[in-house]
Amino acid sequence: MSAAAYMDFVAAQCLVSISNRAAVPEHGGAPEAERLRLPEREVTKEHGDPGDTWKDYCTLVTIAKSLLDLNKYRPIQTPSVCSDSLESPDEDIGSDSDVTTESGSSPSHSPEERQDSGSAPSPLSLLHSGVASKGKHASEKRHKCPYSGCGKVYGKSSHLKAHYRVHTGERPFPCTWPDCLKKFSRSDELTRHYRTHTGEKQFRCPLCEKRFMRSDHLTKHARRHTVFHPSMIKRSKKALACPL
């Protein structure tokens, strides 16, 4: 027997021996590998005849191949699950998979959660987020003018009421200055008009000494200064509202 054949013979003997120890019958039934086990006396006997040695070698190799084929079809045992790891019915009811929004879609995760999970957002989730943002933007301006042919929409009902007076011609804010019969549809228009009688100019330029009756006139003037910034007017308004 050559060296390579002898090594195969020894490996086959080891494989058969391991299979005989591992194949413990369950429920009293002998597995198929038990039927293919070679008797101990045939494995351990001295091989004086070369023909017998070659025969035993071929038998062991055949059994080893059969055992390898059986291992391919051996069912994988599922690991036992402890009772502590089972989810309770309450946890199952409160899982995220059962929660749906009013539109019928699953709640979207925050960008931090998507970044931690390492998965890119799906196109469907991006579509839902886009629809939600559009719906939020539309809800900000939900007061539509009911007048025929006018499609203007406002975020506040008071702004809509003031605009609707343009269609009806209503002017509920009359000027109280003596001999002045003007009326206005908005209170801010009346306030600006009233300053024409009093000469009040409460809007002062923060970069010079000029004053104006209207804030838009002040802004238009202040932009002519090279060092002007819109925050300057905001600070001047706060100082005027809260004098020291």
Swiss-Prot record:
Keyword DNA repair tagged: no
GO molecular function, a single term: zinc ion binding
Positions of modified residues (Phosphoserine): S122
GO BP, one annotated term: cellular response to cortisol stimulus
Entry keyword annotation includes Secreted: no
CDD domains from the UniProt entry: KLF9_N
GO cellular component, as recorded: nucleus
Ranges of biased composition (kind: Basic residues): 134-143
Ranges annotated as C2H2-type zinc finger: 143-167, 173-197, 203-225
Primary localisation category: nucleus
Protein location: Nucleus
Regions of compositional bias (Basic and acidic residues) in chain numbering: 32-51
Stretch list, region Disordered: 26-51, 79-143
Keywords on record: Biological rhythms, DNA-binding, Metal-binding, Nucleus, Phosphoprotein, Repeat, Transcription, Transcription regulation, Zinc, Zinc-finger
InterPro entries named among the record's database cross-references: Znf_C2H2_sf, Znf_C2H2_type
Its biological purpose: Transcription factor that binds to GC box promoter elements. Selectively activates mRNA synthesis from genes containing tandem repeats of GC boxes but represses genes with a single GC box. Acts as an epidermal circadian transcription factor regulating keratinocyte proliferation.
Quaternary structure and partners: Interacts with ZZEF1.
PANTHER family found in the cross-reference section: KRUEPPEL-LIKE FACTOR 9, KRUEPPEL-LIKE TRANSCRIPTION FACTOR
Assigned protein family: Belongs to the Sp1 C2H2-type zinc-finger protein family.
Protein name: Krueppel-like factor 9
Annotated organism of origin: Mus musculus
Lineage: Eukaryota, Metazoa, Chordata, Craniata, Vertebrata
